[in-house]
């Protein structure tokens, strides 16, 4: 029997490697001051605006090289449309990794490290110094069509995945950019929204992932499009100076999102460093403010200095732009992408163990729906085309031969004659829009039509958020959430369908029964159409997004309000079975020291597989309204049939804390607490109690 200790912060073991690669802030700022003295006021004005759409301006004769910034979290978006394409030699190809929400479904910070490291290596090969990711906005509501770029609804899960992402990416010498800071949880006219978030919710939910990324050493942050309490985030001194720099301790480069700021004087004095992508007259406007004495040269120095210090600390000015040796690692990157897909695809339903399907059986397997030949992906800045893309029908026919056959528009007879129907559905989610909590109308019609006529229907859903499944979920025999699996996603999916791989993915968010159940229900302005027309965005009045649910985001809302979800946070099935036994606490009293919680997990089924042990905490008699439970630890365990392991978690007083709006600080109450151990937010096996003295 093995014993595993789950560390409080899983990135700690990697910080030593990271710290050896990046210069200390004091030394970097000293060198930055030396460079700053070489720049004229005109050069400083040019340096605080973007150049060539995705670059930081360089002055090579002064030892300052142009720096390339490129999207995004799920791989390198190869940009062949730069105003001046000769500034950089673009990669010929880049790996299309699974979407970050699929990565979050693995519940594996180690995979997050490997995933980001592989992306960083492709950045280094392509001369990209700063990757514009990870995106880590909290999944607040299911209609946000950018949820696929993020890591789900729980701040602890987000923090663990992001800290390892940052560490993995920056181990390659590529700078991470945490985005979008902050309160950017809807894409509905995002340049016209004003997020109203309580101090407590901001600290307990929306800042925690950013804090984890900063603590892991992230070297840049991108501000968001929206307003925070009535001021645009990218020009808000409160957001940048007070929260990001003073409260979270961020020392490095801050950039605006593209075309997201409006008042130049506020931008310059807010703590912002870099206006992107750089309006054509920005430099002249800066100099105009300077000559009008509305800003000083010190104001510009304060903007430029963190840009220089960040580039110096990362070694951007002292190294070869391209590391072409890393072009040999694409095959390794493909393997990582496939492993992530294998571990992140979620099996939600498996009636009568219809899955896995044995390829040696002579059955008629009808394939219909969408994404048959097309690779599903999210669109916008994060889009990655990939290479060696394998379609769904290609992957399935490799495994099953011609027993899998495709009919675009099957008749009732076609559907009834099939032994199994594989029904592929999904959405094409995209930055800058919201999408309905539903399949497209034609897909919904086909789903109802097929499930009505064949009880052995297995649905494959490729999407970036939850969707309404109320009309047909009960009629399905099987349901697989495939997300956006990247270039190898359908190969991984096929391995799960055949049983070559046992599914182990877990939902990083809740799938509600109806959108009306969501804590964000009613977030759109009264009378607004979901289908926003971006060309008219400037005509839309600024509207408030009131985060009235406060800290009750995701499962915190459903559990506390006793609303039954369709599928709960942390849920996902396997082809084998597990039991949790022998839960123990090292002490039933906590003072100022940690206590340990251990539990033994056994694979009681016939297949090897993996389970995610989830540890939630609850204050039994809180002094303020608190969630029914909060995720504090998790660990993914791989076991052969019959094997068992004992897992030990460390719980600290800090894990009991909530944000006190009166003292504006974290507070820990004395009293009774419960530890809940289980395999989802709604599947709790054991409850243990202890007293905080």
What are these regions (language model features)?
Residues 683-693:
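Short beta-strand elements
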Residues 19-658, 665-682:
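Glycoside hydrolase catalytic-domain context in secreted enzymes
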Residues 3-4, 123, 646, 693:
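Intrinsic disorder/low-complexity segments enriched in polar/small residues
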Residues 1-25:
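Bacterial Sec-dependent N-terminal signal peptides
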């Amino acid at each position: 029997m093995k014993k595993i200790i789950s560390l409080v912060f899983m990135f700690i073991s990697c910080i030593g490697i990271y710290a050896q690669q990046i210069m200390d802030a004091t030394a970097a700022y000293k060198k930055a001051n030396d460079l700053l003295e070489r720049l004229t006021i005109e050069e400083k004005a040019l340096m605080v605006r973007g150049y060539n759409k995705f670059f930081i301006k360089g002055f090579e004769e002064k030892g300052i090289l142009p720096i390339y910034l490129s999207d995004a979290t799920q791989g390198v978006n190869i940009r062949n449309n730069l105003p001046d394409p000769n500034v950089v030699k673009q990669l010929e190809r880049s790996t299309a990794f699974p979407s970050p929400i699929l990565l979050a479904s693995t519940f594996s910070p180690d995979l997050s490290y490997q995933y980001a490291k592989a992306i960083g290596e492709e950045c280094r090969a392509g001369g990209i110094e700063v990757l514009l990711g990870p995106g880590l906005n909290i999944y607040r509501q299911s209609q946000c069509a950018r949820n696929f770029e993020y890591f789900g609804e729980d701040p602890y899960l987000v923090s663990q995945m992001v800290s390892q992402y940052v560490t993995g990416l920056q181990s390659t010498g590529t700078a991470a950019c945490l985005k979008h800071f902050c309160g950017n949880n809807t894409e509905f006219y995002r340049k016209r929204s004003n997020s109203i978030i309580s101090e407590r919710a901001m600290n307990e939910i929306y800042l925690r992932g950013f804090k984890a990324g900063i603590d892991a050493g992230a070297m840049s942050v991108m501000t968001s499009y929206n307003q925070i309490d009535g001021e645009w985030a990218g020009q808000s001194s409160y957001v940048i100076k007070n929260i990001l720099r003073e409260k979270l301790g961020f020392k490095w480069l801050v950039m605006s999102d593209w075309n997201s700021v409006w008042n130049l004087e506020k931008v310059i004095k807010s703590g912002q460093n870099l206006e992107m992508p750089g309006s054509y007259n920005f430099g002249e406007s800066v100099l105009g403010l300077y000559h009008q004495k509305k800003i000083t040269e010190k104001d510009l120095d304060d903007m430029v200095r963190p840009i220089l210090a960040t580039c110096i600390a990362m070694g951007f000015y002292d190294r070869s732009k391209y590391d072409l040796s890393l072009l040999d690692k694409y095959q390794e990157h493909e393997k990582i992408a496939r492993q992530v897909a294998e571990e992140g695809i979620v099996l939600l339903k498996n009636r009568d163990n219809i899955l896995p399907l044995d390829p040696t059986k002579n059955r008629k397997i009808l394939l219909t729906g969408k994404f048959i030949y097309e690779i599903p992906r999210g669109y916008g800045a994060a889009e990655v085309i990939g290479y060696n893309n394998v379609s769904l029908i290609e992957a399935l026919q490799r495994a099953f031969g011609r027993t899998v056959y495709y009919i675009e528009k099957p008749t009732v007879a076609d559907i009834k004659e099939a032994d199994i129907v594989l029904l592929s559905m999904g959405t094409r989610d995209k930055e800058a829009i919201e999408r309905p909590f539903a399949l497209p109308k034609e897909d919904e019609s086909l789903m109802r039509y097929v499930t009505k006529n064949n009880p052995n229907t297995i649905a494959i859903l490729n999407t970036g958020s939850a969707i309404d499944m109320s009309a047909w979920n009960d009629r399905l025999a099987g349901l697989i959430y495939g997300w956006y699996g990247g270039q190898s996603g359908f190969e991984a999916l096929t391995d799960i369908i055949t049983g070559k791989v046992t599914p182990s993915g877990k939902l990083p968010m809740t799938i509600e029964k109806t959108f009306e159940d969501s804590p964000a229900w009613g977030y759109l302005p009264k009378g607004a159409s979901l289908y926003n027309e971006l060309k008219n965005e400037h005509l839309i009045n600024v509207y408030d997004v009131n985060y009235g649910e406060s800290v009750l985001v995701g499962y915190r809302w459903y559990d506390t309000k006793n609303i039954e979800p369709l599928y709960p946070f942390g849920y996902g099935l396997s082809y084998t079975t597990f039991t949790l036994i022998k839960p123990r606490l090292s002490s039933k009293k906590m003072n100022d020291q940690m206590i340990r919680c251990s539990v033994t997990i056994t694979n009681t089924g016939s297949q090897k597989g993996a389970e995610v042990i989830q540890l939630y905490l609850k204050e039994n008699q809180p002094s303020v309204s608190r969630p029914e439970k909060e995720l504090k630890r998790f660990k993914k365990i791989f076991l052969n049939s019959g094997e068992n392991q004992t897992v030990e978690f460390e719980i600290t007083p800090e894990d009991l804390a909530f944000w006190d709006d009166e003292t504006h600080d974290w507070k820990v109450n004395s009293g009774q607490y419960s530890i809940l151990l289980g395999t989802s937010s709604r599947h709790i096996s054991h409850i243990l109690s202890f007293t905080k003295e």
